[in-house]
Amino acid sequence: MTTWFPTIAEAARLVAERRISSYELTRLCLDRIQAFEPRLNAFITVTRDSALAAARDADIAIAASGPRSPMHGIPIAYKDIFETKGLRTTAHSKLLQDYVPTQDSTCVQRMQAAGAVSLGKTATHEFAMGGPSFDLPWPPARNPWDLERFPSGSSSGTAAAVAAGEILGGMGSDTGGSIRLPAALCGLAGLKATYGLVSRAGVLPLAYSMDHAGPMAWTAEDCAIMLQALAGVDPKDPASANVPVQNYVAEIGDSISGVRIGVVRHFFETDVSVTPGVQQGVEDAIRIFIDRGAMVRDITLPSLQEWNACGFVIMLTEAYAVHEARFKTRYQDYGERMRDNIAVGAFLSGADYVQAVRRRRELCTTMAAAMTDVDILLSVGANAEAPLMTEVGKWDVYREPLPTMPFNVTGYPTLAICSGYGSQGMPVGIQLTARPFEEPLLLRVGHAYERETTWRERRPAIAQTSNAAA
């Protein structure tokens, strides 16, 4: 079983049919964690004993009355900014290394209600922004496809753990691309749902008006299954959207014939330079969508530079507002990269913020108008394959616009999925974006693409090793 990598959908069917137990599945994942973690650094806290106990309880409940959801008995983990009752929540920072919340975040509560089994807390960039740092209490996560390379972030540990098969799915957060960038670089699926669809209550904030929480898993279908458990209004999150929870799984296998896809070609051809592997991935995706009956054409939006200038002013100003009090008294306890980011926010003025908010409204209006003529936007998930950890400075988000930022500015639902393998066999990805609250269509298009490729059949070499005994 050591080289068996079930998706959530596959494992859910096997658990429901009692062909495998949650306990066996959880043991498999925990044994991989034990084997890989000294090198991968995907986890900050592993809850082995409580996970096995929860898996046993799941098996008893499923034997008695069947699974209460497809997530029942499925091993997952949480980015270490999701508050967990009685379990430290560190934000990968010295400042919170001993912080133990007294209640669970809403996402944790909803996953528990669905029956998911938590294996622990995963590595992140400090406070979901600091970047990969070596001056923190825990080392940064590494990319399981090549341990000398960067997994991106800030949901780095969750992405690395999913790709390595340590968990079947996990929770991330996304303020400027922190779910989608690591999904692209680690070769998995990551969903930033519509702003307000998934509660952020109990998630340590970075930028209130741009923060999203969402699922990361091996496939678009798995993200849909997780979203089904997560979505819904929450009075504890002031930005929570009071909209009906749809069935995100029921139509995922339906045809995409007639779906109108707009390729934002300037995002990856003129606004920035992407690598040949990234370019090939998006061109191959276009051909697949056409073959499946979609109607594809190019569209134009404001440049990536405009989206990023607006987004970073808002993000950094709001991040400083979150950290101001602590920064003034304990600035030396932040890692260098996070300290520098907060300092930038400190020097932005109220006028800067107001101008960015005004421009944000204009940009949102422009995107809404563009999407009256198309159903889905197609762009790249990241501009390049994963860099070496020693060259991670080249990944500095201030050097080159992020392809992910436009959809944090607008809050539109966006899915990153693997679109192939580029330089030295490292994953590349595409992004698909839908109109607000059209996640069923978005996930259906992503699933249709994945069914036409063999990318989901590959796993990193670390995950093929035989020393993770099941």
Give the location of each predicted region:
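Short helix-loop capping/hinge segments that flank enzyme active sites or metal/cofactor-binding pockets
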Residues: 71-91, 250-265, 314-368, 416-427
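Serine-dependent amide/ester hydrolase catalytic core
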Residues: 10-14, 28, 257, 269, ...
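Conserved hydrophobic/aromatic pocket- or pore-lining residues that grip, position, or stack substrates
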Residues: 29, 51, 73, 79, ...
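Structural helix-boundary/capping segments
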Residues: 9, 35, 113, 164-265, ...
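N-terminal, positively charged, Ser/Thr/Ala/Gly-biased leader segments
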Residues: 9-10, 17-99
